[in-house]
Amino acid sequence: MAFTLYSLMQAALLCVNAIAVLHEERFLKNIGWGTDQGIGGFGEEPGIKSQLLNLIRSVRTVMRVPLIIVNSITIVLLLLFG
């Protein structure tokens, strides 16, 4: 298997899909990353944990419809060209 631009894009799509399907109550809450976790005090920089939680929520919110479209295109391309 050659390392091509298509395989790189497919790997990125799989990673974004993995982030998008993380369920907050089933998975994130079990590892201590639920919504009830404190973000920090006033004037403090948010930590890595809160920034990752914000990234996960943003990906799940913003990328829902584009992921459906890109996944559909990827499936059609795989069916047509193997």
Curated annotation (Swiss-Prot):
Keywords: Endoplasmic reticulum, Membrane, Protein transport, Transmembrane, Transmembrane helix, Transport. InterPro entries: Yos1. Pfam families: Yos1 (PF08571). It comes from the Eukaryota. GO terms for biological process: brain development; organ growth; positive regulation of extracellular matrix constituent secretion; positive regulation of protein secretion; protein transport; regulation of fibroblast apoptotic process. Regulator of endoplasmic reticulum secretion that acts as a key determinant of brain size. Required for secretion of extracellular matrix proteins. Required for correct brain development by depositing sufficient extracellular matrix proteins for tissue integrity and the proliferation of neural progenitors. Acts as a regulator of the unfolded protein response (UPR). This is Immediate early response 3-interacting protein 1.
